[in-house]
Amino acid sequence: MSLLVKAGNGRIDNDGIVNVANPSMTELGLKHISFGLLSLQGGEPRTIRTGSMEMAIVILGGKADIMWTGKNGECRAIVGERPDVFSGKAWAICASPGSEFTLVGNADSPRVEMAVVRSLPLEQAKSFPGAAPGVTIVDPSMIGVRQAGRDCYLRTINDISSAAEGRGLTRLIVGETFNPAGNWSSYPPHKHDQFTE
């Protein structure tokens, strides 16, 4: 089994998301989570439907306009402001199952690049009350930053998903980890692929 997955080999789904890793890629051994990439040119629209999945979209670089119907009617926001992942904290969109929204590449941004993470919500795996359909915008001021590890595995973690806890995400843990040059991300090497109560 190769752990090398090339984004260019991914299939494009109906929402225009390039699937990089998902449960249908049996060689990866994934059961619940999918990872993909979405890129929009300025002015290019894309309607996203979460279906039965919960979803987090992290703006890697550029800006997008988002439109959705909330509890009080039509909602609109501009998400993203950094040119790349090394230029500050991210913006993110967290959406619960049954949600629908439209993203449009912002006219001020020639291109917006996004990482898309999807999972079956926790209530489909265990008995757990699900979130109502909806969209939560996470702006950089909401993202907690912490240091983890020490010595050669010291890293900075920007925790995106805790800002949306209870508002759309029940299973996904989403964030960005920045390691000083030469450092490891964690020690000892490990993984988190089993549900524990």
What positions do the PLM features span?
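A short glycine-rich, His/Asp/Glu-containing loop-to-beta-strand
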Residues: 13-47, 54, 148-197
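Fe(II)/2-oxoglutarate oxygenase catalytic core
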Residues: 27-32, 47, 55, 65, ...
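Hydrophobic alpha-helical segments and helix pairs
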Residues: 88-150
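Long, compositionally biased, intrinsically disordered regions
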Residues: 2-7, 17
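Short acidic-glycine-tyrosine-enriched beta hairpin
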Residues: 68-98
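Short beta-strand His + acidic residue motifs that chelate non-heme Fe in jelly-roll/DSBH
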Residues: 46-49, 66-67, 93-95, 100-108, ...
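Glycine- and acidic-residue-biased ligand/ion/polar-headgroup-sensing regions
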Residues: 51-77, 181, 194-197
